[in-house]
């Protein structure tokens, strides 16, 4: 039997057009693709797998974003013998069918194979975003590798929230495969034979402090290797007291930083700190967050205190809805795609 690839370079969830079609984000995507290609060539990778969510906005693609993403895929097309390009949920116009998606045009590029239907060849299965009851097929399937864009229960959607179990697709349905590699959840994580490889680079404060993203290199029948993009933007949350003790060590270039004001300072002092630290450490964003005094007074040592992001709060509230009142899976999907 021939192998589908010798050495493959793999990445996922780049989300061109994120942050209201931010030029900064699209430029980051371009720079990531350049680094990805350079690293793949150093590792002698002839094949590329993209595991889904090329674009972010599923209803409409901004023309400038489209130009950025087209240039990125043209670079990939010129750099690999074959590119297996999975259609993710953010690439689809409809939630429940894959016949209309934002990367249809890519089939005209040399070497690009659009995976908008299940693909099996040479002991490898490639699975796009699953719709309907397609997941039932997995129970009888087996092989060496799966590349996919799966939404499996009990894996982390972000640093704090696990995917609920809706009693449909289960990790055990993939037991017939040696190794499963997936996009969709941005946090790199592994359970048994299933690995979410982590997205291209951090995108928001849900990724704060977690830089294990970038690309995977997989040589056939070998263990995967992971590479982080050295110039990836980073997200951090600190207390002001810690930043003042070690600004050079904590404030990294091209970072997005939130600082909790855990010490008493005036508005003028806060403004001065922000105006000084941002250019001095080449930060992209610096936000100062006041801490309510009544909260800290009632809990002076901050014991048993957990700070939650807006994402965490909303997703927890959706999960707490009464069974049968709403389709919680649909509500979560709608919220994550906003």
Listing of model-derived features with the role each one plays in the protein:
Residues 159-227:
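Conserved beta-sheet core of the metallophosphoesterase superfamily
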Residues 69, 87-172, 197-200:
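Conserved catalytic scaffold of divalent metal-dependent phosphoesterases
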Residues 4-7, 14, 18-119, 173-177:
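Core catalytic region of metal-dependent phosphoesterases/phosphodiesterases
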Residues 15-19, 56-59, 86-97, 131-134, ...:
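Active-site environment of divalent metal-dependent phosphoester hydrolases
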Residues 78-80, 110-113, 176-179, 274-291:
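Structural alpha-beta junctions
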Residues 76-79, 139-142, 171-176, 250-252:
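Short, conserved loop/helix-junction motifs that constitute active-site signature segments
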Residues 8-10, 49, 126, 145-149, ...:
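Structural motif
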